[in-house]
């Protein structure tokens, strides 16, 4: 079953611009087949701009959100269309792959564990904070495709509210920023991981800028995903550096 629901309108403060946003909510709950408990669960919740910015900027931002959530195969569709088509395609793939797996088990006289044929995908996107004319957007995706546990990946996008373009790390910082920014991130790593035992289990303490960052009035925050610098159990690690420490690294 596929359900679309338009969330209530809200205001996102973006510097001098008040950008109206809405949330696209989609849910899919699909049983693999009658008589079995295996199922597919999909939840999509994506904030996107709807007003108080130019149509060109709005479309550029929505296209970037659609691209990161659904991929190139759904380019050119608006968010609702992309969410619907992606969901339908994912349901079809689920049935094709898992029904074939079930047949293989049955052909060998085996009974698969229910977890092997369960699937979950949660796609969540939301605007966080702003800095000058830049609005940060965080996209989180959780996926489970059998096995011991699922995985979550966080990806940040930074939108120029004058053009709708995604600003990359190399475009935001001045050339040669890498070493000084890495030093600042390492200096604040312990604040992000205050527990000594957790700190000791990290893969490395020599972290570097990875292009995955958000901005706010307070500073910049880098996101390090599961397994990137620490074990899965620690989840994503967010390291923040105040502007006062890195202002000379930023392009004006």
What kind of feature is each model-predicted range?
Residues 1-12:
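Sec-dependent bacterial lipoprotein signal peptides
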Residues 14-252:
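Compositionally biased intrinsically disordered regions enriched in Thr/Gly
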């Amino acid at each position: 079953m596929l359900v679309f629901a338009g969330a209530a309108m809200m205001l996102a403060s973006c510097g001098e611009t008040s950008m109206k946003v809405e949330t696209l909510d989609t849910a899919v709950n699909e049983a693999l087949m009658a008589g079995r408990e295996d199922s597919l669960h999909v939840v999509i919740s994506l904030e996107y701009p709807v007003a108080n910015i130019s149509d060109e900027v709005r479309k550029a931002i929505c296209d970037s959100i659609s691209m990161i959530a659904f991929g190139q195969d759904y380019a050119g569709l608006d968010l609702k269309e992309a969410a619907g088509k992606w969901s339908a395609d994912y349901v079809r793939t689920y049935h094709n792959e898992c029904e074939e797996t079930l047949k293989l088990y049955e052909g060998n006289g085996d009974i698969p564990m229910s977890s092997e044929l369960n699937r979950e995908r949660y796609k969540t996107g939301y605007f966080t904070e702003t800095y000058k004319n830049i609005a940060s957007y965080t996209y989180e995706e959780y996926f489970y495709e059998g096995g011991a546990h699922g995985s979550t990946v966080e990806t940040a996008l930074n939108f120029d509210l004058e053009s709708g373009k995604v600003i990359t790390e190399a475009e935001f910082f001045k050339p040669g920023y890498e070493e000084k920014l890495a030093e600042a991130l390492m200096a604040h790593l312990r604040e992000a991981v205050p527990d000594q035992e957790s700190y000791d289990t990290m893969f490395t303490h020599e972290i570097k800028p990875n292009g995955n960052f958000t901005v706010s009035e307070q500073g910049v925050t880098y996101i390090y995903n599961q397994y990137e610098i620490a074990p899965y159990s620690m989840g994503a690690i967010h390291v923040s550096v105040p502007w006062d420490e890195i202002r000379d690294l930023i392009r004006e």
